[in-house]
Amino acid sequence: MEEMSLLNHSGGPVTRSRIKHDLADLGLKDGDVVIFHTRMSAIGYVAGGTQTIIGALLDVVGARGTLMVPCGWNNAPPYDFLDWPRDWQDALRAEHPAYDPDLSEADYNNGRLPEALPRWPGAIRSRHPDASFAALGPAAAELMAEHPWDHPHGPDTPLARLIAHSGRVLLLGAPLDTMTLLHHAEALADVRSKRFVTYEQPILVNGQRVWRQFRDIDSEEGAFDYSTVRRGVEPFEAIARDMLSAGIGRQGRVGAADSYLFDAGPVFNFAINWIEAKLKR
């Protein structure tokens, strides 16, 4: 949207103090460990952009709180490059840069905040190339440490540690289907029809570029056959809406954006039960 459209959408500039007030009204509080997903255009004209949003979040969670975002890697080799002609594969392998937590851009599909937060002084980004997260705050080092190479959405991952920290999930204008924590439920759900992918990406090992194979749930095409979900509704949105109907989560407005705040533990428990009840066959 153009600036005036955004200003009209939000009824004037959305300032740091306004965001702080709205976040507090939604239920975010001092000491929270929170993963957040943001669609900035839904909020309106944010005066100061990503810096303002991060600043307001830090104001609310305080010195004891920790912020977390899903990053990924925007310029990762495609999963299917092994289907390319051999000389193309060889050229890619020879020169594709390794994933570097300090330099590699976050996936553009995740919005502007996952690119901004890792640049914040003191932020830490996890080591996994395809499923990296970043965190800022006193719990950041523990959340990001030794992100497992295989099954990066499963046990002993940043998502699992978020739950262990009694963390929360915040959607700032982002659609309900962007809730990355639901991949953790997919990874741990006991359903035989679960889909996995195996892929190769370059990483840094002792400063040297090394190609490594990884295994994960298929988070791109879908970890399960979700065909029972109503046509036109994303599976994660269906889970989240059922969750809200069950009384899990709070809804409010941040700027002009419909926003949601959930406790991570109940989200995980509800989602894993939902998946196993509806998809186990």
Swiss-Prot record:
The keyword Transferase applies. This is Aminoglycoside N(3)-acetyltransferase IX. It comes from Micromonospora chalcea. Resistance to neomycin. Disulfide bonds: none annotated. Pfam families: Antibiotic_NAT. One of its GO terms (molecular function) is aminoglycoside 3-N-acetyltransferase activity. Keywords: Acyltransferase, Antibiotic resistance, Transferase.
